Amino acid sequence: MSQDGVQWCRVWVTMLLLLPSAPVEGGELRLMRSVLISLQRVQAASKTEQEILDLPPGARPALYCSNKCTLRDWCQLWCAYPSNTPTHCLVSNIIVMPTYQETNMGDVLTCHTTRPKDLATNTNITAGKHYVPNPLRVKENLVDGFYNYDLNQCFYTEWSDNDTWFTLDFGQPKSFQHVILYAQVNRNAKKHFNNVQVRVSNVTAVTPPEDFAAYDLFGEFPGEASPGQVVEMKSPKPMCARFVTGHMLHIYLFQVCHIEVF
């Protein structure tokens, strides 16, 4: 493969936090990462459960709440609050990436997310025109590190096949092995997420979307997505690339609700 093309590279090394998160008496470990998020956002999630902390002497709130999250297969985030002297435990299905940047600091909590540290959050993004009748569904929603299963947090393109795409630019080659795309949660997912390709490259950005074929194919989803489907594409080895593109080949309005690259 040419020097400017995609290259295999060494595994990206990071420090991860391991928190006990099985039944309290158990020993299972689960990866958790701390993140700041507004209490209001957590409470507004499509699914959040709250429990009063009723702990025996010497028990740790963090262990209790982590355990509550682990026992729910839909849980993506947990918080013990108030943070200084917690009396409650929140578990939620809200997607919050570890590098999410909270803007509402008035009621901020230190929470713990199950999501991995990724490259898409806060990176540069270009894309086709968004669908004007839905002004909130802009490309920036894909890189803000936050998703609450609300359609207005998705990116929605115009109908033209010249617009059914997005490109992430990391600024320099980065190592990753997974690209994950979230389809919308309703039955129209089959129309708006249909025949999607992901391509990667280190070369100078090309003219989208007609020149995307010059990039290396990372993965593809040839069918129609089901409501809320999470599409994970995985390379057999970690690889290095600067650009990641997503392109729907089916000519219709393209909608993606969340992206992770790690």
Range-by-range predicted roles:
Residues 84-86, 95-97, 132, 172-175, ...:
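Conserved beta-strand elements of beta-rich interaction domains across eukaryotes
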Residues 77-98, 194-195:
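Disulfide-stabilized extracellular beta-strand modules
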Residues 159-165, 186-262:
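Trp- and acidic/polar-enriched beta-sheet ligand-binding modules for extracellular glycan
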Residues 111-173, 184-191, 220:
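Disordered, acidic Ser/Thr/Pro-rich linker "stalks" and the adjacent N-terminal cap
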Residues 25-38, 95-130, 260-262:
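Extracellular/luminal ectodomains of metazoan preproproteins built from arrays
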Residues 5-76, 155:
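Conserved small-residue hotspots that stabilize compact domain segments
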Residues 50, 163-167, 175-178, 230:
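Intrinsic-disorder/low-complexity, polar/charged segments enriched in Ser/Thr/Lys/Arg/Asp/Glu/Gln
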Residues 66, 88, 241-245:
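Short, conserved beta-strand segments of beta-strand-rich sandwich/propeller modules, principally
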